[in-house]
Amino acid sequence: MASGDTLYIATDGSEMPAEIVELHEIEVETIPVETIETTVVGEEEEEDDDDEDGGGGDHGGGGGGHGHAGHHHHHHHHHHHHPPMIALQPLVTDDPTQVHHHQEVILVQTREEVVGGDDSDGLRAEDGFEDQILIPVPAPAGGDDDYIEQTLVTVAAAGKSGGGASSGGGRVKKGGGKKSGKKSYLGGGAGAAGGGGADPGNKKWEQKQVQIKTLEGEFSVTMWSSDEKKDIDHETVVEEQIIGENSPPDYSEYMTGKKLPPGGIPGIDLSDPKQLAEFARMKPRKIKEDDAPRTIACPHKGCTKMFRDNSAMRKHLHTHGPRVHVCAECGKAFVESSKLKRHQLVHTGEKPFQCTFEGCGKRFSLDFNLRTHVRIHTGDRPYVCPFDGCNKKFAQSTNLKSHILTHAKAKNNQ
């Protein structure tokens, strides 16, 4: 702008000619907008897609502002890589074609952490990153696993899941084509912690001393507790329970021969897979004559296990702690290192458990699978249909559950 124009404006009194105002508006002030945009590598997704194992965490930052100055990105993103910590805020613009970019704020926060969700045995701790995304856009179609609320959610952008943001639409979608078998890619689940002791839902774990009252007296135990919810039942004191009084009913006897009452079990709909799973949840236990009654309950809320003595209950308590032993191959997490070592046999192909029946010799990675296999030879079918008039038996509990569903659904249709 000419210096004479500047002096004219400064010396003018109260009013400014319209022509001069127009000259001021011609001086386009878009440099700050473009500067902000060039700090976000908007098209880096194309490079990251070629290396999904390391770039999943950057996907969440590319969607919010791709349409504002995409041609500027093209000149910059090949020359440098920004740190994965990106804060992308919606830009103020009068262009009606860019309104959809006002709908979201994407915060990408990178840290190495075990990430998980619904399936506590399927926690993931890969070399990928964790994105925290605030998204007030409608949840994408595709089932419960893809549902994203309008809140700050944790998305595991691990390489195998390929999770990230779409570069053009301001929406979040799952990438990577085929879905992984894990269900734990949205955080906030009930899983336990790993890595640095932090849970997928940013749950903080601590050990607490809890007083337990029994008929033999009081004693204290150390147990894990998280800040997400009250894991300890009955505040800090757990009274001893006597089986048959306050403890939940044990339905395992119906899985091993006892028939259901004519009217069924009140309050249980066996045609509902969830209720059926609860019905068949407890494994049948062989009762010995010298078996002492199990009178001491686990103090963790939601756990119904009972124990014969204090030491047995103490041994059990650590199973409610953080799952810090993580399989590098698939991301499953375990409380005990021995369980992780046993699980890793599945990936190594090692099969140390061999069937000893003559002429068989089949080998298995897990002892559980061998025990199930042996029933083929022995003819042992310990799982019996509980419906009156049906005497079918099964070698595996899963087969019995499927069979029970056919009875229950047929009964409901009558």
Swiss-Prot record:
Q: Give one GO biological process term.
A: negative regulation of miRNA transcription
* Sequence segments annotated as region (Disordered): 32-83, 159-203
Q: Where is this cross-link: Glycyl lysine isopeptide (Lys-Gly) (interchain with G-Cter in SUMO2)?
A: 182-183, 208, 230, 286, 288, 409, 411
Which residues, renumbered to this chain, carry the PTM Phosphothreonine?
A: 378
Annotated site residues (Cleavage) in this chain:
121-122
- Keywords annotated in UniProt: Activator, ADP-ribosylation, Cytoplasm, Differentiation, DNA damage, DNA recombination, DNA repair, DNA-binding, Isopeptide bond, Metal-binding, Nucleus, Phosphoprotein, Repeat, Repressor, Spermatogenesis, Transcription, Transcription regulation, Ubl conjugation, Zinc, Zinc-finger
What is the protein's name according to its record? Transcriptional repressor protein YY1
> Record-annotated residues binding Zn(2+) 2?
327, 330, 343, 347
Phenotype when the gene is knocked out: Spermatocytes have a significant decrease in the global level of the heterochromatin markers and increase in the chromosomal double-strand break (DSB) signals at the leptotene/zygotene stages.
Q: Where is this region: Binding to DNA?
A: 295-414
Q: Where is this region: Involved in nuclear matrix association?
A: 257-341
Oligomeric form and interacting partners: Interacts with YAF2 through the region encompassing the first and second zinc fingers. Component of the chromatin remodeling INO80 complex; specifically part of a complex module associated with the DBINO domain of INO80. Interacts with EED and EZH2; the interactions are indicative for an association with the PRC2/EED-EZH2 complex. Found in a complex with SMAD1 and SMAD4. Interacts with SFMBT2. Found in a complex with YY1, SIN3A and HDAC1.
Biased-composition ranges, Acidic residues, are 42-55
- Basic residues bias: where? 68-83, 171-182
User: Which residue windows does the record flag with biased composition (Low complexity)?
Assistant: 32-41
Q: Does the keyword Protein transport apply?
A: no
Q: Note down the stretches annotated as region Involved in masking transactivation domain.
A: 371-397
List modified residues, type Phosphoserine. Answer: 120, 247
